[in-house]
Swiss-Prot record:
GO molecular function terms noted in the UniProt entry: ATP binding; metal ion binding; nucleoside diphosphate kinase activity
Name of the molecule in the record: Nucleoside diphosphate kinase
Species in which this protein is naturally found: Methanosphaerula palustris (strain ATCC BAA-1556 / DSM 19958 / E1-9c)
GO CC annotation: cytoplasm
Role this protein plays: Major role in the synthesis of nucleoside triphosphates other than ATP. The ATP gamma phosphate is transferred to the NDP beta phosphate via a ping-pong mechanism, using a phosphorylated active-site intermediate.
Taxonomy, superkingdom: Archaea
Binding site for ATP: K9, F57, R85, T91, R102, N112
Cofactors that this protein relies on: Mg(2+)
The UniProt record lists the keyword Oxidoreductase: no
InterPro entries membership: NDK-like_dom (IPR034907), NDK-like_dom_sf (IPR036850), Nucleoside_diP_kinase (IPR001564), Nucleoside_diP_kinase_AS (IPR023005)
Recorded coiled-coil stretches: none
Entry EC no(s): 2.7.4.6
């Protein structure tokens, strides 16, 4: 099974959307294997979003991510990164399809509720950054034999 990283951003936490987002991922058959609240430090934000540091929007993105607690999670399932990205929807909520997390809950591109790794490689990097060596569990959900052959 593959693992991917998901972060509910400060606007999602403040709006009480954690339960709805977790339910959508679980309803899809994914399994949460790690989770915690954290107010991210500047160094962690810089490493997480390192590909955006030189972009003009980065200072406001960093301020937003550091403005409140985030809910960090690792999810497991077949093609986990691709499945979660599909459920998440387009980065810009105005372009995200209804029924996706951003389509239903995102307000604008600057307050889009959720981050999800875009590929297995970035998932591995983000999991190592946010859950280094500890905090992940292995278990079998009762429905796994039905969901996965």
């Amino acid at each position: 099974m593959d693992r991917t990283f998901v972060m509910i951003k400060p606007d999602g936490v403040q709006r009480g959307l954690i339960g709805q987002i977790v339910a959508r991922l679980e309803d899809k058959g994914l399994k949460m294997v790690a989770a915690r609240f954290e107010r991210l430090a500047e160094a962690t934000v810089n490493e997480h979003y390192r590909e955006h540091i030189e972009r003009s929007f980065y200072p406001s993105l960093k301020q937003y991510i550091m403005s409140g607690p985030c809910f960090l999670m690792v999810w497991e399932g077949k093609n986990a990164a691709a499945v979660v990205r599909t459920l998440t929807g387009a980065t810009n909520p105005s372009e995200a399809a209804p029924g996706t997390i951003r389509g239903d809950y995102g307000l604008d591109i600057g307050r889009n509720v959720i981050h999800a790794s875009d590929a297995p490689e970035s998932a591995a990097r983000e999991i190592a950054l946010h859950f280094p060596g500890t905090g992940q569990v292995t278990y079998t959900r009762i429905d796994e034999p039905v969901l996965y052959e």
